[in-house]
């Protein structure tokens, strides 16, 4: 039996749209991208949506923005970020690249989301942020995470690449932190 490695999954309409973009000379950040960003922001009830080539780039951009000297209160080298141990290198490495120290904590065995009790136990005077990953469509307990971050004046940044369309108490994932 022959099982193909891959197959063409694009419809003719999608191919035509791609060719239209290529012919326009605007293959990145063009009118179609701007229209899609606007539509996605409306869909997700967000003020803004900015598209990048990957979640990895989004993570890097977030940490570099937070350490940029022109930001209202830039994070200083040595800041700590609480992250789940079930993670990716592209979650951890941008923190390190921007001068931070990742602090790994346990995850819930049922959801693979960051364990809230572990987050609370890991908070130190150097903790600047909590960076939960929302794996496989599972949204973390955002009520508790938000309350913890508010109580300790810690930044909350969600990595919601895997929860597109998921909601927590009616609110779209990705809309709880920065």
Which residue ranges define each predicted feature?
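Structured helix-beta-strand junction loops
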Residues: 24, 46, 125-126, 151-152, ...
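N-terminal "arm"/small-domain region of PLP-dependent enzymes with the aminotransferase-like
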Residues: 1-26, 31
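Phosphate-binding glycine-rich loop
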Residues: 31-80, 94-97, 104-105, 171
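PLP-dependent aminotransferase-like
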Residues: 68-135, 139-151, 155-160, 167
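Conserved active-site segment immediately N-terminal to the catalytic lysine
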Residues: 158-178
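Short clusters of hydrophobic/aromatic residues that line enzyme substrate/ligand-binding pockets
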Residues: 5, 27, 114, 164, ...
């Amino acid at each position: 039996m022959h099982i193909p490695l891959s197959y063409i999954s694009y419809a003719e309409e999608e191919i035509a749209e791609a060719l239209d973009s290529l012919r326009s000379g605007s293959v990145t950040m063009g009118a179609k991208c701007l229209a899609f960003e606007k539509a996605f922001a409306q869909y997700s009830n967000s003020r803004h949506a900015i598209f990048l080539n990957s979640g990895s780039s989004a993570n890097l951009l977030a940490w570099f923005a937070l350490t940029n000297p022109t930001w209202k209160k830039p994070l200083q080298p040595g800041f700590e970020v609480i992250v789940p141990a079930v993670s990716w290198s592209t979650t951890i490495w941008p923190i390190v690249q921007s001068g931070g120290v990742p602090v790994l904590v346990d995850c819930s065995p049922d959801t693979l989301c960051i364990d809230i009790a572990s987050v609370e136990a890991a908070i130190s005077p150097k903790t600047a942020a909590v960076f939960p990953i929302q794996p496989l469509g599972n949204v973390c307990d955002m009520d508790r995470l938000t309350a913890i971050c508010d109580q300790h004046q810690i930044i909350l940044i969600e990595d919601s690449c895997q929860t597109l369309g998921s909601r927590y108490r009616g609110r779209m994932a990705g809309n709880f932190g920065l």
